[in-house]
């Protein structure tokens, strides 16, 4: 049987993610397949780089932690199809979270996966859910 955690423990674990990454997190949306893990080299073309708000995730509740504030870029970096994202600390080098990008059924929901250089776009939904929430 897998370990089970209380809602209180799950919420604390989720809140620790934002604390560990810091208040100046950087989101990069990329083309191509998601790397094997956060320790693997970056892959794909960077379509957008977003400096996230200083309080970029809401407080965890009921075993889930959702994005906070507006996550938007007024000018995409390149043209291509968004397929995955990585969240880095303020240095923009160390990956701490990664996942898929799409308009539905993915880890991060965006308004459009077809990026054109200089286009504006918005991240609609991003929520981290604890494993047994």
What residue spans do the PLM features occupy?
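Small cysteine-rich, disulfide-bonded extracellular modules of the LU/uPAR three-finger superfamily
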Residues: 1-85, 89-133
């Amino acid at each position: 049987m897998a370990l089970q955690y209380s809602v209180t423990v799950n919420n604390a674990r989720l809140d620790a993610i934002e604390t560990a990454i810091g208040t100046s997190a950087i989101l990069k949306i990329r083309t191509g397949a998601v790397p094997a893990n956060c320790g693997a080299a970056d892959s794909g073309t960077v379509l957008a780089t977003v400096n996230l708000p200083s309080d970029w995730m809401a407080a965890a509740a009921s075993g889930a932690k959702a994005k906070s504030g507006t996550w938007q870029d007024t000018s995409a970096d390149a043209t291509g199809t968004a397929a995955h994202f990585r969240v880095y600390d303020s240095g923009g080098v160390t990956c701490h979270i990664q996942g898929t990008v799409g308009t539905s059924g993915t880890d991060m929901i965006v308004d459009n996966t077809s990026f054109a250089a200089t286009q504006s776009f918005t991240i609609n939904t991003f929520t981290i859910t604890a494993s047994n929430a």
